[in-house]
Amino acid sequence: MRLKNKPWANELVEEHPESALDRPDPAEKIDWEARFGNDKPIEIEVGSGKGQFITTLAKQHPDRNFVAMEIQKTAAGIILKKKLDEGLDNLQILCADAANLVAYFGENSTSKIYLNFSDPWPKSRHEKRRLTYKDFLAKYQAVLTGDGLIEFKTDNSGLFAYSVKSMNNYGMHFDFMSVDLHHESEEIVEKNVETEYEHKFASKGQPIYCLHAGFLAK
């Protein structure tokens, strides 16, 4: 969902190049170790929206590094404000297209990728835009370490069914799957970190579909 343009958010991104990259040239390698100041494992959320999910994770896990990858500059600015307000040194913002994922991160550089409530692109002619289309899966496989995982959540049953089929056809393995995440065991529900969108629709009784999947050994 496209957010209304907020000039202050756009300006904030431009004012803080140390914390947010605005559409960097894919031909120029990003030195993530230098940007974070350490070599801790990196986890990426592709399509971070307003950032509730990724900022919560960053607070919960100071021993990990997180990248919020968001194509909308206004959304990136909103996430950046949360990062700065909360002093989250283990969070970087990348305002860029996920199509360039491999160029931005390199191979075997990432331990986990989060796909939360991605655009379902329901029309058949837009299949290649879905973030669980086979071409995107190939990009995730390239940047993930051998034991790295994709964690995927959606409220769209059609996208979930498509994603299960796409990942299965790609030869991936599933470590966890739920067609009603918020009614799983208490332990699973307590560990779940909600997005803004998820909280809104789950509170209305909308089932949340979820899966965790990995790739076979490279």
Curated annotation (Swiss-Prot):
Pathway: tRNA modification; N(7)-methylguanine-tRNA biosynthesis
Top-level division of the source organism's lineage: Bacteria
Start and end residues of each stretch annotated as Disordered: 1-26
Positions annotated to bind S-adenosyl-L-methionine: 45, 70, 97, 119
GO CC terms, sorted: tRNA methyltransferase complex
E.C. numbers: 2.1.1.33
Signal peptide: none
Biased composition (Basic and acidic residues): 13-26
Pfam families per the UniProt record, alphabetical: Methyltransf_4
Segments of this protein annotated with the region Interaction with RNA: 125-130
GO molecular function: tRNA (guanine(46)-N7)-methyltransferase activity
Top-level EC class: transferase
Catalytic activity: guanosine(46) in tRNA + S-adenosyl-L-methionine = N(7)-methylguanosine(46) in tRNA + S-adenosyl-L-homocysteine
Record keywords, A-Z: Methyltransferase, S-adenosyl-L-methionine, Transferase, tRNA processing
Entry keyword annotation includes Mitochondrion: no
Positions contributing to substrate binding: 123, 155, 195-198
Active site: 119
Record's function text: Catalyzes the formation of N(7)-methylguanine at position 46 (m7G46) in tRNA.
Family classification: Belongs to the class I-like SAM-binding methyltransferase superfamily. TrmB family.
Protein name: tRNA (guanine-N(7)-)-methyltransferase
Organism: Lactobacillus delbrueckii subsp. bulgaricus (strain ATCC 11842 / DSM 20081 / BCRC 10696 / JCM 1002 / NBRC 13953 / NCIMB 11778 / NCTC 12712 / WDCM 00102 / Lb 14)
Lineage: Bacteria, Bacillati, Bacillota, Bacilli, Lactobacillales
